[in-house]
Amino acid sequence: MGKYVVALDQGTTSSRAIIFDKEQNIVGVSQKEFTQIYPHEGWVEHNPLEIWSSQYGVLQEVLAKTNITADEISAIGITNQRETTIVWDKNTGEPVYNAIVWQCRRTAGIVDELKKDDEFAEYVKANTGLLLDAYFSGTKIKWILDNVEGAREKAEKGDLLFGTVDTWLVWKLTNGKVHVTDYTNASRTMLYNIKELRWDEKIINKLGIPTSMLPEVKNSSEVYGHTNLGGVGGVRVPISGMAGDQQCALFGQTCFEKGSAKNTYGTGCFLLMNTGEDMVLSKNGLVTTIAVGINDKIEYALEGSVFVGGAVIQWIRDELQFIHDAADSEYFAKKVEDNGGVYVVPAFVGLGAPYWDMYARGAIFGLTRGANRNHIIRAALESIAYQTNDLLTAMAEDAGCKLASLRVDGGASRNDLLMQFQADISNTQVLRPIITETTALGAAYLAGLAVGFWESKEEIATKWAVSKSYGPTFESAKREKLNKGWKNAVSRVKGWAE
């Protein structure tokens, strides 16, 4: 048994490789950003070959800079941006089109047509746990087949394969030998029946997707195949853990108990609550998804997705050029006592849960002559907490109880002003763990459990510990006034682009 597990964390803006030891210490990290492609308004793409080269590059780099040899690696786990859709030629290994990213809204028109069939929309929700939306993979595959020359003909001949990013990476790591996904990633395609645990023929046929394109669905923790680290003749290392980034974060936060929840503050924000073996269908705009599948035992989760979370700070930095570094946002936000009545609604690509409005667009409200750069920066930061609070409110109604506490992770969870405002506006205890790399840690856990590197979930759970706790300080009247202002702002951006 080797001394380490490697997590490959393929995110929306960068690829990372993180090495953990048995005590969950981070031994090494390598990261590489890659190109964001915006061909038209509302469209977002990545180059699948750049995803692969950046991910494989950081794997090689982290091993080199830590002087860890391949035979010291017990297993590789993969976590990935979900829903992002790649279609490639199985004979040449070449993608037929760029990866269509989860944020991309190009299939909104396809979704509108599908929504005209009320019975089908209800069927999708009841069987996939998802809502008909451009966010998920199904309509993205259809778009590629309908719009890339020769793609449909190739697909019908059985020459094309579909995969979310996890599937693509495993296929590349195994030199095209293994075409698989796991339960969690399958549950984000809008093609997978999460009750019966199978690809849903009714939905697949409605979208015109040949079943030969679809990967085999496996557990989130099992050996899928091996990769040669060090090239041909190198050490064969098992790839033995795989889950979507948000499910990995839930697992990495050791939210193993029914009712436990976490929020990840990344490019978007993603709130997940473990509902155990109960598949709870939301009445409040959330989606139902698979939390994890181990030994063919499925646990479900309620999920709310915010499309633009930390990305609003990138916008403040890159487009408005108010700050030089994302970390500066807290410094400038603290220069004013409050938002000065200013609200930023960052609906750049529509609104996710609980609104699900593909046609909403971003806006800044409440500007007066006294409003300055710092008010806008603060309002942008606060928008992340307001959107999360919308999810918490919906989740409490669906679950029938208020969350006692919220475990947090992701880059923006290190922002103390944001975390305190989250506790205040949500009237909830916010807990940041010592290890905030919970997404990568979850992938490492899943891989390690499959090969005996860690013995059990119980062993893992004992390692979770709080770094900082934030308690609510607002009076209820202040909280209600601020939330009312936010709701007013959101109401004005809905349907803007119709």
Curated annotation (Swiss-Prot):
Which molecular-function annotations from GO does this UniProt entry contain? ATP binding; glycerol kinase activity
Q: Per its UniProt record, what Gene3D superfamilies does this chain match?
A: 3.30.420.40
Under Enzyme Commission nomenclature, its number is 2.7.1.30
Keyword ATP-binding attached: yes
What is the stated purpose of this protein?
Answer: Key enzyme in the regulation of glycerol uptake and metabolism. Catalyzes the phosphorylation of glycerol to yield sn-glycerol 3-phosphate.
- The protein, known as: Glycerol kinase
Could you name the domain of life of the organism this protein comes from? Bacteria
Swiss-Prot/TrEMBL keywords: ATP-binding, Glycerol metabolism, Kinase, Nucleotide-binding, Transferase
Q: Where does this protein act, in terms of pathway?
A: Polyol metabolism; glycerol degradation via glycerol kinase pathway; sn-glycerol 3-phosphate from glycerol: step 1/1
Which reactions appear under catalytic activity for this entry?
Answer: glycerol + ATP = sn-glycerol 3-phosphate + ADP + H(+)
Q: Which residues bind sn-glycerol 3-phosphate?
A: 12, 82-83, 135, 245
Q: Give the family this protein belongs to, as stated in its UniProt record.
A: Belongs to the FGGY kinase family.
Q: Which CDD domains match?
A: FGGY_EcGK_like
Pfam families cross-referenced by the UniProt entry: FGGY_C (PF02782), FGGY_N (PF00370)
Oligomer and partners: Homotetramer and homodimer (in equilibrium).
Q: Which GO terms describe its biological process?
A: glycerol catabolic process; glycerol metabolic process; glycerol-3-phosphate metabolic process
Q: Which residues bind glycerol?
A: 82-83, 135, 245-246
PROSITE patterns linked:
FGGY_KINASES_1, FGGY_KINASES_2
Q: Where does ADP bind?
A: 12, 16, 267, 310, 411, 415
Residue positions binding ATP:
12-14, 267, 310, 314, 411
